[in-house]
């Protein structure tokens, strides 16, 4: 680990394909936007020798932020893979966006990784969304470590931030969150700020000074020993308390000096088991320096303490018919099981799929089975196809290095899988398998869009289909009631990136229009109507008269048609014609142009002509009768109501309840959950929650999540209904 007093192992440059799973580490970087994840990846790449000079986010020169959108916004918006090699180990660094709108990219990174580095700014602290991701990792036992960045800030407080991390991440055992190093400070400047120039190794009792631009090891001074020993004892006690050797604590308390090698081995095992969470510090390299502060120590932790892919259980696997299939973890000779964790479009090579291989070995030019199931509700139809694998490559940001194979445990990019989408399983053609999907948040911000011009109409459908194939946190809806094309996103930033990609990648200009909800109409009371369609001015005429009664029904009843004609007043062959006309008019609406629902229409009487009556005439009469019945009674305008479930921190429950009240919501109940959070259930009109995905984030400072489901339609308040009717009249 970084505390081992060994010589610098040197850097082997950019990593290529791994030859054995034991020589791979898959690590995802997690943290809020601006915490320094991308800068840290750049510093690690420099220390490992993968780059000769570290780029800056502000200049658009980093390896992992290579998209033009990322350059303009100066933040990550997608998952990026940067493999480096350290001490003979290939380290796949997965840089993820920190902004909540791009949580789908984060979840893909978590799926592909075997361990996580939580990056925390020394000056900004831990936000609510980072805490929630930590809890998700804890639930599945993913090993984690914490890296404190922005040590150069005048507001940086390493000791205070370590305590904050212990409180935020330690749960019932805050002593499991302990630093392996303390910052080493240089001389104070004129402003009184003493810059961090290196680290104090607690286990090794060594100083690691980076002031020269490269790590140099030395002994601590007498004045540094008291603070070091106090922190060292806390660290040793923390390691021993998590040791699998139950005699170690007794020996330590009995005065035995536990040797350095035993402590390091126990530390590494505890980290790999996901029960001990070391805190490290890191800072980017200064101009001209070869190594950033703490980067050597961090690479040693990753290669020595983080688990190999052998220790990562394979997610559940079934046959495509749903029969469970036992797959040995990371068996390079086993059946092929791989998963597409990211899909991107390259202007030169077409679709590129980033794949994590869980079992077997993937090779170019092989035919594989591509299977995607379980996302039909998001516009991803179930699909099973055979496809030929194109070239395999190891990515380094936007660059690609061709490789000959990818073994179980490794990550690789596959070219030209035309049907594969994010989340799909790749398996052998003659042994098709399916991995259980990972959990993705529902996109809850609707974006109604239209092609800007005729020339854009054909390209829009193709562009949207590709976007949704790449990003399973987007959902495409063609609403048959409002006749709108709606792209559901996770938030405004997510929507902005989607629009920009439509324009820049697919050459589609779109207009964003107000999103409409699916309103309905119904009768407030019983009413009758007579439809008379008579035209007899010579030649073959039209003759149809019908009388109906309309009465309201309970919600969810739809349109019920009843025939009570006696004596053949309406010939039997024309009764279906009346019903067809009634249903056609109901679909168009009878007041404000919204479909009519939840009524019973009873045909009572009518008249026909032996020559001039026809199917078309009675359809028209049926429609006229329904319109007349509507003119004599109050028509309710119905709005859809959603059942909303909100998980929010206890501190924000009051604000959430007050906001729901302002949205005409009805709180159904609350329920206390774990982690000082409350589950709030409410019913809210859909017209009031169009932007709730954005507003809730603001109300809860990013700590709340919600889901919504259609409950029913119910009458709108009269003043709101009248406003909508006026808008309809003004538009007609």
Task: List each language-model region with its residue ranges.
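Structural and coupling elements of P-loop NTPases
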Residues: 1-732
């Amino acid at each position: 680990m970084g505390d081992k007093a060994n010589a610098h192992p040197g850097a082997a440059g950019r990593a290529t394909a791994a030859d054995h799973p034991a020589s791979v580490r898959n690590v995802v970087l997690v943290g809020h936007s601006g915490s320094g994840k991308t800068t840290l990846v750049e510093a690690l790449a420099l220390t490992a020798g993968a780059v000769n000079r570290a780029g800056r986010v502000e200049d658009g020169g980093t390896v992992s932020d290579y998209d033009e959108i990322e350059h303009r916004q100066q933040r990550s918006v997608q998952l990026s893979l940067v493999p480096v090699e350290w001490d003979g180990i290939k380290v796949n660094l997965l840089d993820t966006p920190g902004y909540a709108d791009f949580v789908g990219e984060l979840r893909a990174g978590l799926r592909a990784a075997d361990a996580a580095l939580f990056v925390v700014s020394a000056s900004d602290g831990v936000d609510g969304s980072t805490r929630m991701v930590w809890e998700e990792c804890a639930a599945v036992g993913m090993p984690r470590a914490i890296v404190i960045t922005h040590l150069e800030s005048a507001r940086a407080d390493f000791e205070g931030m370590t305590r904050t991390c212990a409180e935020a991440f330690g749960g019932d055992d805050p002593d499991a969150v302990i630093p392996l190093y303390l910052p080493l400070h240089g001389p104070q400047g004129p402003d009184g700020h003493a810059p961090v120039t290196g680290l104090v190794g607690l286990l090794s009792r060594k100083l690691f000074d980076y002031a020269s631009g490269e790590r140099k090891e030395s002994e601590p001074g007498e004045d540094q020993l008291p603070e070091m020993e106090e922190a060292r004892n806390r660290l040793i006690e923390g390691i021993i308390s998590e040791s699998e050797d139950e005699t170690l604590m007794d020996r330590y308390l009995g005065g035995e000096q536990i040797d350095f090698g035993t402590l390091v081995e126990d530390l590494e095992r505890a980290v790999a088991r996901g029960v001990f969470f070391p805190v490290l510090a890191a800072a980017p390299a200064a101009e001209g320096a070869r190594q950033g502060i703490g980067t050597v120590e961090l690479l040693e932790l990753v290669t020595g303490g983080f688990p190999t892919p052998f220790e990562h259980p394979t997610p559940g696997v079934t046959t495509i018919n749903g029969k469970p299939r036992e797959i040995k973890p990371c068996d390079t000779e086993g059946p092929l099981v791989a998963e597409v964790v990211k899909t991107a479009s390259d202007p030169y090579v077409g679709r590129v799929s980033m794949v994590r291989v869980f079992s077997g070995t993937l090779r170019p030019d092989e035919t594989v089975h591509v299977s995607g199931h379980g996302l039909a509700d998001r516009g991803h139809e179930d699909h099973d196809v055979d496809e030929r694998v194109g070239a395999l490559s190891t990515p380094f940001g936007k660059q690609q290095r061709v490789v000959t194979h990818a073994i179980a445990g490794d990550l690789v990019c596959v070219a030209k899988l035309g049907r594969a989408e994010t989340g799909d399983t790749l398996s052998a053609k003659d042994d098709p398998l399916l991995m259980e999907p990972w959990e993705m948040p529902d996109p809850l911000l609707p974006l109604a869009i239209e092609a800007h011009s005729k020339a854009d109409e054909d390209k829009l459908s193709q562009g949207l289909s590709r976007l949704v194939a790449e990003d399973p946190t987007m959902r495409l809806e063609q609403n048959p009631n409002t006749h709108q094309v709606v792209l559901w996103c996770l938030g405004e930033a997510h929507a902005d990136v989607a629009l920009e990609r439509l324009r820049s990648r697919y050459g589609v200009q779109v207009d964003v229009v107000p999103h409409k909800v699916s309103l309905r109409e119904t009768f407030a009371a019983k009413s009758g109507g007579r439809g008379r369609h008579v035209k007899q001015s010579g030649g073959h005429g039209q003759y149809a008269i019908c009388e109906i009664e309309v009465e309201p029904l309970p919600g969810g009843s739809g349109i019920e048609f009843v025939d009570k004609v006696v004596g053949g007043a309406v010939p039997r062959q024309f009764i279906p014609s009346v019903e067809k006309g009634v249903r056609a008019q109901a679909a168009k609406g009878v007041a404000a142009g919204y479909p009519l629902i939840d009524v019973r229409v009873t045909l009572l009487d009518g008249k026909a002509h032996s020559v001039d009556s026809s199917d078309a005439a009675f359809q028209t009469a049926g429609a006229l009768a329904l319109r007349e019945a509507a003119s004599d009674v109050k028509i309710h305008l119905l709005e859809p109501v959603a059942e909303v479930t909100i998980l929010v921190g206890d501190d924000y429950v009051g604000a959430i309840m007050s906001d729901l009240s302002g949205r005409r919501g009805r709180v159904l109940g609350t329920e206390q959950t774990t982690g000082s959070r409350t589950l709030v259930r409410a019913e809210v009109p859909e017209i009031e929650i169009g932007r709730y995905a954005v507003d809730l984030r603001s109300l809860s400072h990013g700590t709340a999540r919600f889901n919504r489901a259609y409950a029913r339609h119910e009458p709108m308040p009269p003043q709101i209904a009248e406003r909508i009717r006026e808008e309809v009249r003004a538009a007609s």
